[in-house]
């Protein structure tokens, strides 16, 4: 059975109470990957996957998920600034649909507006060279996306 693809809050209802999540930042050339601790408090970068073909990319992501005992994915959804969905969102949703056929782990979609810009500003402020930024930007964007999702889930859990 294919994985569920849901907004983050709905997906959280399908994840167990504990367990790591993998955060994904889809780029055209790379996929940034981050992982949470099992208590879902902290996101850490683990890899930038150079995109090849969908099957190879998906196999690598599934191997990373298995190696970290992940129970789900958080996929950054690149909405336009006005909240509308453009071509990048359509591409991300297509990736999610294809990826969901290969796993049963629920996929939570999380608004990633400005994630790459925020990460780039932070890297520039820390005097990271342009060449180094190009290599690590997607992984750091995945950390930013996943940490934002974890913080939102923690806020909801405290409200319960």
Swiss-Prot record:
Enzyme Commission (EC) number: 3.1.-.-
Stored CDD domains: YqgF
Recorded GO CC terms: cytosol
Keyword Isomerase recorded: no
GO biological process: one example: rRNA 5'-end processing
Domain of life of the source: Bacteria
Similarity-based family: Belongs to the YqgF nuclease family.
Protein name as it appears in the record: Putative pre-16S rRNA nuclease
Originating species: Rhodopseudomonas palustris (strain HaA2)
Organism ancestry: Bacteria, Pseudomonadati, Pseudomonadota, Alphaproteobacteria, Hyphomicrobiales
């Amino acid at each position: 059975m294919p994985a569920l693809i849901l907004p983050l809050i709905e997906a959280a209802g399908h994840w167990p109470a504990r367990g790591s999540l993998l955060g994904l930042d889809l780029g055209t050339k790379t996929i940034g990957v981050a992982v949470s601790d099992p208590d879902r408090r902290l996101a850490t970068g683990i890899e930038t996957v150079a995109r090849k073909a969908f099957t190879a990319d998906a196999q690598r992501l599934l191997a990373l998920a298995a190696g970290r005992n992940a129970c789900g994915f958080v996929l950054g959804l690149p909405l336009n600034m006005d909240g509308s969905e453009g071509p990048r969102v359509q591409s991300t949703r297509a990736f999610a649909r294809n990826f969901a056929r290969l796993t049963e782990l629920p996929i939570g979609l999380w608004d990633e507006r400005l994630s790459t810009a925020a990460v780039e500003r932070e890297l520039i402020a820390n005097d990271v060279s342009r060449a180094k930024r190009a290599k690590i930007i997607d992984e750091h964007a995945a950390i930013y996306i996943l940490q934002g999702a974890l913080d939102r889930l923690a806020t909801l859990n405290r409200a319960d």
